[in-house]
Amino acid sequence: GVIYLLLLLFCIVQFLGPNHTEVVRIGWLFAVSAVFNALWIICWHYEKLPLSLLVMLGLLVSLIFINIRIAGTSNMLIKAAFGIYLGWICIATIANVTALLVHYQWNGAGISGEIWTIVMILIGMVITVLAIRKFNNPWIGLSVVWAFTGIMIKRQADFRSIVVTAAIAALIVGFFIIKSFILAKNP
């Protein structure tokens, strides 16, 4: 909901707003990301998991390139729209890989599902912190904190270690979000 609303606002503003520099920087990549998004929905709906992962990777790469191109912008709407979108797709890509592994009944190389979940949370946290810093975009972290909060709520009754890991990861990402906003105001 929020991502599509922000993307809709981006579409409206690009026609109404006086600042077209950011729109030109993004260029055709926005259309590419939209095509990948639509294809992913179709692949996921029809449970074409290997294909859905490939399409998701295409979406992820297109969003990375968009975020590279807008790293220097001060336009908050553009940073928020594509930052939140990238953060969500980073986490969704990890979830898509996990779904594919479960589909193929991967045994986790002898490591428990609980430990693998903790590892995936930590990988998501590290990728998010690096992305916030690389793209100078604190918005990337917001959807990741949201995802980690969802994990905490879902797992609170059964896996305390997962809940604690997700909470710590959310706090660390939150720290970098705040730090990035502060640095943006005081360069």
Residue ranges and their predicted role:
Residues 57-68, 148-151, 170-177:
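Alpha-helical transmembrane segments and their membrane-interface exit regions
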Residues 139-150:
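Central hydrophobic cores of alpha-helical transmembrane segments
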Residues 1-53:
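Early transmembrane hairpin module of multi-pass membrane proteins
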Residues 110-126, 152-174:
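Membrane-interface transmembrane-helix boundary segments in multi-pass integral membrane proteins
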Residues 15-16, 69-71, 177-187:
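Membrane-interface capping segments at transmembrane-helix boundaries
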Residues 40-53, 71-76, 104-111, 131-135, ...:
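Membrane-interface helix caps and helix-loop-helix hairpins in membrane proteins
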Residues 29-41, 55-66, 80-98:
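Alpha-helical transmembrane segments of multi-pass integral membrane proteins
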Residues 78-87, 106-120:
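A loop-to-helix transmembrane entry motif
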